[in-house]
Amino acid sequence: MEKFTPSELCADIKIYDYKKKVKYDEKSLVIFEKTGKMITAGKECEGMLYTLPANSIGFSPIVLGRVSDYTCAEKMLKQMLYRYLGKASFTGYGEGLIFIHEKLNEVEMKAYFDLLYQAGAKNVVYADESVKGIPEGTPWEDVIWGMKNTYKNLRFAVEITKEQPMDYFRYSLAELAENCKRWGLEEEMLKLYI
C-alpha cells in the first residue's frame, strides 16, 4: 500500500472558544517519546515529524474522522483545551460541543463523548452535518458559532474536519485496493476503475 504521512491522514481540529469568540486551528498530531511521555500535540508537530529523534514517534490519533488511538487522542485534546481555554476549574470547562463531519456509528460517537468528558467538559452536546433547520449553503463555522443560541451554556466547541479531503480519498482507495488484493478481487476492482 502507498505510504501516507501522519499529516496527510490526520484530522483537522478547530476549537471554538465561545467566551472569547475566537477559533483556533489545530491538527490531530502527537509526538511521543517511546517511554510513553507526550512531547507535544497539534500543528506544531508537522514541522517536527521529519526530524524526530530516534526515541520518538509521531502519528495521528484521529484518522478519517475516527478515533484510532483513544489514550493519545485524550492526551492531545486535554493539551489543546488547556492551551486555548486555560486551566479547567474544579468543575471542568463547562458544556462542550463536538461537531463531526464524518458519518459515525454509535460506538464511534461514544468515543467522542468520552473524549470530551475526559478532557474536562462538564456536559457534552453532539452535532453533525445532519443538524435540522440549517439554511442550505450556510458555512459550518457559522452553524457552530450559532449553536450558542440553542445551547446557552456552551463554553467551547471542538470540530473534527478535513481541510484536504483528497488525502482521505487517496488513503481510502489505497486501503480498498489492499483489501481487494487480500480477498482475491483484484480483477473486479480493476473493472470498476477502468
What residues fall within each predicted segment?
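Nucleotide/phosphate-binding catalytic cleft detector across ATP-hydrolyzing
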Residues: 1-25, 32-37, 45-194
